[in-house]
A protein has these predicted regions:
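Periodic small-residue-enriched repeat registers in elongated scaffold domains
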Residues: 1-168
Length: 168
């Protein structure tokens, strides 16, 4: 793409204004950024330019949602404006923040609208009818000591939904 930068071993920057630094990273969408080792910013299953303004930093992180951010190790921010930090966390609701270790995903509203705001329950002062979804989660799942990634037992210590409900 135009104005892309790829510095390092086997890095790819595709999509206008994308930057890829480190080793074996992919910056797929428009204005996406990767740094570290084996990270992906953008939705590689879609055309170049989809899921723009995503950032993936660290080791084996994925930021595939539009304007999403993932960092640290083996984290995934897969919905729009979502953030995943820690070890093997997944942020799969609109605007969600997942921190900690190996959280349980698939809770709330995991519908993805890559270009608009269909995944959020409250727009233009009106409730849309969508599930309020998860705003914040702290994962406290196990770690697979042989891989250093999340194990087979994901778990959540704390969940806050957009409607204000909290679960311990």
């Amino acid at each position: 793409g135009a104005s892309t930068v790829a510095i390092g071993y086997k890095n790819h920057a595709a999509g206008a204004g994308s930057v890829s630094l480190g080793q074996e990273n992919i910056a797929w969408g428009t204005t996406n950024f990767t740094a570290g080792y084996q990270n992906i910013a953008g939705d590689t299953n879609a055309s170049i330019g989809t899921a723009g303004s995503a950032t993936a930093i660290g080791l084996q992180t994925i930021a595939s949602g539009r304007s999403s951010f993932s960092a640290n190790k083996n984290t995934s921010a897969i919905n729009q404006a979502s953030t995943a930090l820690g070890l093997s966390t997944v942020s799969d609701n609109f605007g969600m923040l997942a921190i900690g270790v190996n959280n349980e995903a698939g809770i709330g509203d995991t519908s993805i609208d890559p270009n608009d705001y269909g995944g959020y329950y409250y727009a233009d002062g009106t409730y849309t009818g969508s599930n309020p979804g998860v705003a914040f989660v702290i994962g406290n799942g196990d770690i697979d000591s042989s891989t250093g990634k999340g194990g087979d037992n994901p778990s959540n210590a704390f969940i806050i939904s957009y409607d204000g409900n909290a679960t311990l």
